[in-house]
């Protein structure tokens, strides 16, 4: 239950670096979801996973909807998030950004400073990235793509997801 009496929710963003996840969060989710992202921690910080889980637990305990904006490429990454959300009675939606390696590398190349990820890191995530599904414990999976007009096209993931 959220602080305003609604059903608790968690959004887990899944996709490559520079896939549009953070922009999507700002444009579509920021008005009702608390943001948790390892990108907000100092680059060399230790214990990022534990820190992230603490922030998730705090938000859920306070009854706030929470969005986790990381690459979240595998069940090992999203499994603990799903468990925490369900333990608090929250529904969990995966926001799946299908991989476009060339597009992510182009967008990443335009980033500056610490926001730019080495190409080898983007490629490593691409190799391990797995499409999330309801069989992984998600209550729903939606697919997010660029709409070609500067926005996003969001629709339920095709069957089998």
What do the PLM-derived regions correspond to, one by one?
Residues 1-14, 19, 30-31, 99-161:
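Conserved GTP-binding G-domain of TRAFAC-class P-loop NTPases and closely related GTPase folds
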Residues 10, 65, 91-93:
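Short active-site oxyanion
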Residues 14, 19-68, 73-76:
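Conserved substrate/cofactor phosphate-moiety recognition/catalytic segment
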Residues 27-28, 80, 84-88, 128, ...:
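Alpha-helical structural signal in soluble globular domains
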Residues 33-35, 92-94, 141-143:
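Conserved beta-strand scaffold positions in the cores of enzyme catalytic domains, especially
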Residues 34-38, 89-91, 116:
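Short hydrophobic/aromatic-enriched beta-strand-loop microsegments
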Residues 52-56, 85, 110-114:
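Short, hinge-like loop/turn segments at secondary-structure boundaries
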Residues 74-107:
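Mid-chain, well-packed structural core segment of small domains
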């Amino acid at each position: 239950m959220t602080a305003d009496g609604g059903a608790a929710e968690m959004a887990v963003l899944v996709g490559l670096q520079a896939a549009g996840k953070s922009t999507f969060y700002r444009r579509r989710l920021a008005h009702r979801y608390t943001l948790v992202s390892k990108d907000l921690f100092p680059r060399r910080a230790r214990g990022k996973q534990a820190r992230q889980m603490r922030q998730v637990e705090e938000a859920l305990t306070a009854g706030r909807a929470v969005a986790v904006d990381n690459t979240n490429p595998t069940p090992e990454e999203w499994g603990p998030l799903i468990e925490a959300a369900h333990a608090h009675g929250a529904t969990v939606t995966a926001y799946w950004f299908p991989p476009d390696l060339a597009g992510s590398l182009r967008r990443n190349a335009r980033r500056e400073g610490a926001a730019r990820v080495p190409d080898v890191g983007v490629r490593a995530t691409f190799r391990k990235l797995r499409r999330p599904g309801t069989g992984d414990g998600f209550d729903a999976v939606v697919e997010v793509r660029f709409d070609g007009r500067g926005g996003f096209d969001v629709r339920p993931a095709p069957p089998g997801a």
